[in-house]
Amino acid sequence: LTIDANGHWFFTANSAFNQLNIGDKVEETFTVSSVDGTPSTIKVAINGTNDKATVSSATVAIDETDRAVTTSGTLTSIDVDNPDNAFTPDSISGTNGDLTIDANGHWVFTANSAFNQLNVGDKVEETFTVSSIDGTASTIKVTINGTNDAATVSTATVSVDETDKAVTTSGTLTSTDVDNPDNTFTPDSIVGANGDLTIDANGHWVFTANSA
């Protein structure tokens, strides 16, 4: 503290006092005097405020499987006026799943379904907002990527008697596929040792023997 002959005084703190939180304070009293020696005091109080924490965020991507996926991680928080890595515990229900975070910043996301309907190139995303203990917000973004789930495809085993001409037989396969239209096949024409087989996009196949 400095004071001039006109009584104008000026106080400069010797640090930023960022460690002071709301409700904290430091006080100091300075004694000055008039020109005839009469003393007086100047009392300075520095009140704490909430200095915003520096909080990490998270962005994760996981592939869907045949069951509800789970992923987890840990956020960090650097806070000059609160304990580091202190978070507000929370449990958040989202559109694609639920997220929990504990006081140490450890979070866990659990999907609410297997998301088997997602094909390669498909995805669902969701962003959760969490906060450190001082209220500084951060986000956790979870992306679930689609994969190719194997279809359940029928087979066919047929037996035909030979005749005096090249025999023909046919049938239809079925396909159940969670991430593609059901009963969708790749058309093909296959030359075999005993005959030729064709199959169309609907799974209908025809075998024609190459001799009688």
Label for each model-derived stretch:
Residues L1-G48, D66, L75, S91-N145, ...:
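Acidic, turn/loop-rich segments in luminal/extracellular domains of secretory-pathway
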Residues N47-T54, T147-T152:
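Proline/serine/threonine-rich low-complexity linkers at boundaries of modular beta-sandwich domains
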Residues T54-S93, T152-I190:
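Extracellular ectodomain surface segments
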